[in-house]
Amino acid sequence: NVDAVLISPNFREETLALAAYLQENKIAYAFVDFNMEEARALTYIGQDSYKSGYIAAKILMRNYSAGEGQELVLFLSNNKDNPAEIQMQRRLDGFMSYIAEEYNNLVIHEVILNKSDQESNQQTLDEFFRAHPKAALGVVFNSRVYQLGEYLRHAGRSMKGLIGYDLLKANVELLKSGDVHYLIGQRPGLQGYCGVKALCDHVVFKKSVEPVKYMPIDILIKENIDFYFEFV
């Protein structure tokens, strides 16, 4: 028998079906990483995706120089319209909210990258950077900023500012090398710990649980990344 379930809801329809089953069987469940509000979990533990996008823009645009005519690039997933990409869309919404407030005349490009076809990505990026030499600032809203960072390194190119999400090994290596300038960490270990604790408090100790517990939005650079992992 199952008393409680901790879920990272990456897939909309599957998550809704699981949530309906758990509700019918009176089994408590909590979400980490992404909140799917209509599934009515006991609690959500993770970042505010919209705010993290807003902050990402604010950090990235510190590198902006209007006098150089710099242009901004949104590197988006080819699955961006998939319901599983809702978290990325919320980050994008927050990011663009800050840009709209502060940089009305900024030239913005969108480049679609394929999750699994690096050869196609290379061709896309080669053509884009040849056509847009002033594209100096970039953002990736998922964990695959390494795709872009590795391309820049191998192509002998660089950007004035590049920000992405998640502390995958490949991302961290590129942060340390300077090919990626910022990573936003989400403390997945702490999310899991808080999720289990909330379920235990509810199921075992009959305590009330907050419906939302937001994690800090951590900005990592090459100078502080080595001090971070002990506390993730």
Where in this protein do the model-derived segments appear?
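Conserved phosphoryl-transfer motifs of two-component systems
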Residues: 43, 181-182
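Hydrophobic alpha-helical
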Residues: 3-23, 109-171
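Hydrophobic alpha-helical segments within soluble ligand-binding/sensing domains
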Residues: 45-71, 171, 186-204
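Hinge/cleft segment of the Venus flytrap/periplasmic-binding protein
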Residues: 83-84, 99, 187-232
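Hinge/beta->alpha junction and helix N-cap segments in small-molecule ligand-binding domains
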Residues: 46-54, 76-94, 106-123, 140-144, ...
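Non-catalytic structural scaffold of enzyme domains
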Residues: 12, 17, 40, 61, ...
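Flexible loop/hinge segments that line or gate small-molecule binding clefts
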Residues: 17-51, 168-176
